[in-house]
Amino acid sequence: MTVEMELVGVRVQMPTSTPILLLREVTGRRRVVPIYIGGPEAHAIDLALSGTPTARPMTHDLMREVIEGLGAALERVVITELREGTFYAELFLRDGAGGVQTLSARPSDAVALAARTGSPIFAEEALIDEAGIEESESAEDEGDEEEMVEELRKFLDEVNPEDFLP
């Protein structure tokens, strides 16, 4: 079963300056899934979130234009699994004839493309069970984003990529 996620943003883990993509469940337990990504991908996602125009199309802008130019649309993105410390994702493209094509993608590329097309992001529930982090009760009850961010920062300061290995 898949669960709809919202793109919280990209944060930087200190002291390594490693970018981390943060996705949160839209409903339910509102767990957060942190995904380590590369610097260029983090920049691409930040540009999409901020709506910052660029002089020339970025790679994910080009991907969007190619998809639309072929008469297709990005229906949704699904973060599918975590295997040996690596996250996997799939793009679901609806073609002009109404068929759906599924393409394997890195989560960072899938999310960057979804951010540019306004397409929904989902994650497999088993993946959220495995890699998700619970929000604190008080942050959820009070709607205190700052408390949630601080809790997440503490987690990110202590976590290592190896923690996600089986």
PLM regions with names:
Residues M1-P166:
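Divalent-cation
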